[in-house]
Structures are given as C-alpha cells and as structure tokens.
Amino acid sequence: MQENTRLRIAIQKSGRLSKESMKLLSECGVKMHIHEQSLIAFSTNLPIDILRVRDDDIPGLIFDGVVDLGIIGENVLEENELKRQSLGENPNYKLLKKLDFGFCRLSLALPQENKFQNLKDFEGLRIATSYPQLLKRFMKENGINYKNCMLTGSIEVAPRANLADAICDLVSSGATLQANNLKEIKVIYESRACLIQKENALIKEKQALVDKIMLRVAGVMQARESKYIMLHAPKEKLDKIQALLPGVERPTILPLAHDEKNVALHMVSKENLFWETMEALKEEGASSILVLPIEKMLK
C-alpha cells in the first residue's frame, strides 16, 4: 500500500500545551480550520493533517509510527518512555527541537506542617502522583523506599483527603500547592514542550516538508526572543552603545540628514531589552529609541 504523503502531526486537544501548539503551527504558516469537537484538522495550504488527541497518547503514536511528528511535554514523553521500557519494549523517536513554551517542573511536596530535613524524610511515605515512572526512577537513584498512590487528577488534595502523605506533581507557579497547604520540597524533573519525530525514515516528500517546518520553527522562536532596535546615537559613543546591545549580527549604521554628529543605528537584538538597558542607552547619548517586536525571522 502506498504511503500517504500528507504529514501527520499530533498535538494536545485541550490543556496547557494546546493553544501554544496551535499558535506555533499558525506562526509557521500552517493554515487550518479547527472545530472544537473534531479530532483531526486538515491544513488548507500544506499537505498536513493535525491530530488533536490526549497528551498521554502522543508518545505512543510516535513510538508506534502512527503519526510523523508530535508536540509534547518532556515530562509526558519521558514518563511514557520509561513505562514502555518497564514492559520490555525499546521505544524510539527523534527529538527535533525543544520549544519555548510549556515550562514546568515535577516536584515532591509535603503538607506545610510537616518538618523537613532531607530526602530521607520521604522514606516509607505514601506518595500520590500521576507520574509513577519518573517518581520511581528518582527514588531509586536516591535509595528511598516509598509507597505509590497512583492518581490521574487532583493530586494536590490527596494529603488533605488522607489518601497520601505527600505528592509528586507538576508545578508552574506554586499557587496551587499553597492553596492546598502544601510546600514544594524537591524538583525531580524539569520539563518544557518539545517537537519529536517518529524513528522510521520518512518518504522524500514528507521529509522535505519537515525540513521546511523546522526552518520556520527556528525562525519563529528566534523572532520571539529578538527585538528590532532603532535609535539615534552620537558617533563618538557608538562603541559603548553597541556594547549595551547584544546583536544577532552587526548593526546597520545610517547617516542622518543635516546632522554630522549623530547617526541612526538599526539592529536585531538577541535579547529582550529591559528598561535598565534603555536607560543606560539614554545615558550614553542615544535618543529616539524604538524597540519593535519581530514577527518572523530567517538567518
């Protein structure tokens, strides 16, 4: 049977990575119409199908070669990889790129009233988690015996409901822990979204499309962390002013009409400019300072 030449990309249907995944694809020029209840969306300008599934299903779809690409949190990817390995399987995939969203951490937490001295305080405790494999690996590496309490949601209420003594759950800001009278003790895994590809080689048409998408993803991410700077600067202060601006490439220096002492400086800065930097530029004699966002960028 001839392989379908349309590229299949799996993303989270709903949840913390869903909107950012769709935004990334859109910024990469993938046009599509999404219906809320639909599990699949077809790109209208590229041979791409978007599968909207549960995040826990994405690693398996990649491991089994059902889809070509997937956007998934590293925590879910690693948990599923460890689970497959525990069953004697050897899951394979290609990590194409770590993305700039979905940042979180998997942490051990205890009730606020519990005194904590070191990790051995978790010895023999019952720990509620949705990530048993990551927890098991960490505890084994640290020589700690514990009892596992597998839950799929509302992990933070487990101690209060007397289901567990402690929890191991995802933390972003820590507000949920605080609201449930818990304190974060130890980060056991740091995670972000990533773009992965199935291990088996793609046909020529699909690989060419993946290469195009990867170029665009890199451009989008670089644009997000860069700013276009325009300012007027005294000629004698150019070196000091340029030193304050970490640029992707050398700046463009342009003469100003009827002004022999100053020039216009245009450049792409690889870092976000804070007020302190702009104030430092001002102190060095820069004026008319403009900091503009960059929508797309290719080096």
UniProtKB/Swiss-Prot annotation:
It catalyses: 1-(5-phospho-beta-D-ribosyl)-ATP + diphosphate = 5-phospho-alpha-D-ribose 1-diphosphate + ATP. GO terms for molecular function: ATP binding; ATP phosphoribosyltransferase activity; magnesium ion binding. It comes from the Bacteria. Keywords: Amino-acid biosynthesis, ATP-binding, Cytoplasm, Glycosyltransferase, Histidine biosynthesis, Magnesium, Metal-binding, Nucleotide-binding, Transferase. GO terms for biological process: L-histidine biosynthetic process. It is an enzyme of class 2 (transferase). GO terms for cellular component: cytoplasm. Its EC number is 2.4.2.17. Its cofactor is Mg(2+). It is found in: Cytoplasm. This is ATP phosphoribosyltransferase. The lineage of its organism: Bacteria, Pseudomonadati, Campylobacterota, Epsilonproteobacteria, Campylobacterales.
